[in-house]
């Protein structure tokens, strides 16, 4: 009984048990029990091991529990078979989620004016998964001091959103860029330029492409006119 171990009511017993998957796919199971906030005993290699903090009570407890091999067999089965099987099942079910990679989208905007002659540059990054991401305001290859990162916010589709801001003088904004590093991008970082460089593509689409279409239409009109005159 409890009197044999000199336990007095009331007392607090704490315990933790589980299994861990280590590198090389080795699974280590454990069970540790505490008494009154101190380490008491642990189950290792199919046997009860008293902890030094447990003193003589822990030693007597292990002697006592060893007499009941049925109890140790149940504990051993739970630790060596049931727990690892459950762990591998959970990992297998969540493998797709663990390896899930979703590329981020990024865009730039300006925030509320910090003061006269100053701009608040905002780099938005959204739709990425997993959560770890690095977003930097850069000038060339130099990361800019004063970059402020907001909280990473969970989207409705379980991807993430982040905004990173930089307060600069209006005359110093040209040439700055926002760089996004994420595991889904590999070595292909997203780089968005503030100012004119970011509009080069829009200029091409808005001016060059319509001009080409106009030239093609004129060429077709002249060709049809020439063909008609040839027939006559």
Curated annotation (Swiss-Prot):
Q: What is one term from the GO cellular component aspect held by the record? A: lysosomal membrane
- Glycosylated positions are 45
Cytoplasmic compartment ranges equal 223-232
Source organism superkingdom: Eukaryota
- Chain ranges on the Extracellular side, renumbered to this chain: 1-201
Per its UniProt record, what CDD domains does this chain match?
Answer: IgC1_CD1
Residues forming coiled coils: none
**Keywords, A to Z?**
Adaptive immunity, Cell membrane, Disulfide bond, Endosome, Glycoprotein, Immunity, Immunoglobulin domain, Lysosome, Membrane, Transmembrane, Transmembrane helix
Q: What are the cysteine partners in each disulfide bond?
A: 19-83, 48-62, 123-178
| Keyword check for rRNA-binding | no
Chief location of this protein within or outside the cell: membrane
Q: Which ranges carry the Ig-like domain?
A: 84-194
What membrane topology term does the record carry? Single-pass type I membrane protein
- Decide whether keyword Transferase is in the record: no
**Residues that span the membrane, as ranges:** 202-222
Q: Tell me, what does this protein do in biology?
A: Antigen-presenting protein that binds self and non-self lipid and glycolipid antigens and presents them to T-cell receptors on natural killer T-cells.
Additional comment? During protein synthesis and maturation, CD1 family members bind endogenous lipids that are replaced by lipid or glycolipid antigens when the proteins are internalized and pass through endosomes or lysosomes, before trafficking back to the cell surface. Interaction with saposin C is required for the loading of bacterial lipid antigens onto CD1B in the lysosome.
What PANTHER family does this protein map onto?
MHC CLASS I-RELATED, T-CELL SURFACE GLYCOPROTEIN CD1B
Name of the featured protein: T-cell surface glycoprotein CD1b-3
